[in-house]
């Protein structure tokens, strides 16, 4: 199975998953890049997966379905183009892989991540939940939900690959360096982020550079406390403080 990022809009990635002469597209913000990819690689669209109902994730799903009406569109019930409604625990297949749906709200009150298990490991298509060195902004969900999902992600094998939907890595790493100026792994990742795409990333990598997965590290907690000017008594409080600090960071 081959997984390729296709650039769209300003900083979006539409992930294309190939098996034989069939493909899945994940979060098609617009149809044209997907159609061009399919034609160039002589592929048929087999499935579309949508993580949440923002235009830069579902904007091209309806047009793709009209062009490939035999190919299902997977998404929660608030995805207008969905032909196959998913909920937490929904399972289906693509090629030789098993897909499991996780409910991962926080960025939005309804958000889905798709875990694709293949012979070479677990691939997580996480939309706007986890970014490399960062996390999604909280819009209609809650920071508590986002924190809980990071704890759940952190229980996956360290070789798990994450496929976020945006190229935010360099900006996120600059914030991470602001939180942990002495973290050599962050400095190394910053240099590497000059070259894109920076994705996918392993869970092992994110544990070293993502402050939102490092809320139990004393240096992270102490830095967050110094910046917000109060004691933070739990991982959740550190996570919430980091999210507010990131919102204001320039």
UniProtKB/Swiss-Prot annotation:
Catalytic activity from the UniProt record: an S-(2-hydroxyacyl)glutathione + H2O = a 2-hydroxy carboxylate + glutathione + H(+)
Q: Where in the chain are disulfide-linked cysteines found?
A: none
Alphabetized GO MF terms: hydroxyacylglutathione hydrolase activity; metal ion binding
Q: Does the UniProt entry include the keyword Hydrolase?
A: yes
Q: Pathway it acts in?
A: Secondary metabolite metabolism; methylglyoxal degradation; (R)-lactate from methylglyoxal: step 2/2
Question: What is the uppermost EC class here?
Answer: hydrolase
Q: What is its EC number?
A: 3.1.2.6
> How many cofactor units bind, and how?
Binds 2 Zn(2+) ions per subunit.
Record carries keyword Coiled coil = no
> Which InterPro entries does the entry link to?
Clx_II_MBL, Glyoxalase_II_hydrolase, HAGH_C, Hydroxyacylglutathione_Hdrlase, Metallo-B-lactamas, RibonucZ/Hydroxyglut_hydro
Key words of the record? Hydrolase, Metal-binding, Zinc
Cofactor requirements of the protein: Zn(2+)
Q: Which residues participate in Zn(2+) 2 binding?
A: 56-57, 128, 166
| Pfam families in UniProt | HAGH_C (PF16123), Lactamase_B (PF00753)
Q: Which terms under GO biological process does the entry name?
A: methylglyoxal catabolic process to D-lactate via S-lactoyl-glutathione
Q: Which residues bind Zn(2+) 1?
A: 52, 54, 107, 128
Q: Which family does it belong to?
A: Belongs to the metallo-beta-lactamase superfamily. Glyoxalase II family.
Role description: Thiolesterase that catalyzes the hydrolysis of S-D-lactoyl-glutathione to form glutathione and D-lactic acid.
Subunit description: Monomer.
Kindly provide the name given to this protein in its UniProt entry.
Hydroxyacylglutathione hydrolase
Q: Which organism is it from?
A: Neisseria gonorrhoeae (strain ATCC 700825 / FA 1090)
Source taxonomy? Bacteria, Pseudomonadati, Pseudomonadota, Betaproteobacteria, Neisseriales
């Amino acid at each position: 199975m081959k997984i390729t990022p296709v650039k769209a809009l300003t900083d979006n990635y539409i992930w294309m998953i190939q098996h034989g002469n069939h493909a899945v597209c994940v979060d098609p913000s617009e149809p044209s890049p997907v159609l061009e990819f399919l034609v160039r690689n002589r592929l048929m669209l087999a499935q579309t997966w949508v993580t949440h109902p923002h235009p830069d994730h579902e904007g091209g799903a309806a047009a793709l379905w009209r062009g490939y009406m035999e190919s299902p569109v997977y998404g929660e019930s608030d995805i207008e183009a969905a032909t196959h409604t998913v909920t937490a625990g929904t399972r289906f297949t693509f090629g030789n892989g098993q897909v499991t749906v996780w409910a991962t709200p926080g960025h939005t009150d309804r958000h889905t991540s798709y875990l694709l298990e293949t012979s070479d490991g677990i691939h997580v298509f996480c939309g706007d939940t986890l970014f490399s060195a960062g996390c999604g902004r909280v819009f209609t969900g809650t920071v508590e939900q986002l924190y809980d999902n990071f704890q759940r992600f952190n229980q996956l094998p360290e070789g798990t690959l994450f496929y976020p939907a945006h190229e935010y890595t360099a900006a996120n790493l600059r914030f991470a360096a602001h939180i942990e100026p002495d973290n050599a792994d962050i400095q190394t990742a910053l240099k590497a982020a000059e070259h894109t795409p920076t994705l996918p990333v392993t869970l092992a990598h994110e544990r070293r550079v993502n402050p939102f997965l490092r809320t139990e590290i004393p240096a992270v907690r102490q830095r967050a406390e110094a910046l917000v000017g109060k004691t933070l008594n739990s991982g959740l409080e550190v996570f919430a403080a980091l999210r507010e600090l990131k919102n204001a960071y320039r």
